[in-house]
From Swiss-Prot:
A cellular-component GO term for this protein: membrane
UniProt keyword Coiled coil present: no
Membrane-traversing stretches: 16-36, 42-62, 64-84
Top-level lineage group: Viruses
Bilayer topology term: Multi-pass membrane protein
Keyword line: Host membrane, Membrane, Transmembrane, Transmembrane helix
Chief localization: host cell
The protein, known as: Putative transmembrane protein ORF24
Localization: Host membrane
Amino acid sequence: MMLQTAFTDLANPSYLNMGLALLLATIMVMILWAGMRLKSPAVFVIWALTSITLIFTFVTQFSFIWFWVMVMLSLLLISIVASIRYTL
């Protein structure tokens, strides 16, 4: 329930608590770790785009949508790169 409240309030630029900041940092570290592990430039590009999206998250009124779209695209790209890399 608290996590849901934190993500609901993500659209408010003045709101950022420690738990939400930790969650965002964890997501960024996981994407960066996947990029280093898979040695794929595409994952590093997604990491940079996710950083930009986090800025949009606190600037635009559609921040909640932007954030989740970018997280889902990042995870999708990581899974595709991982499956291609380990299949070949």
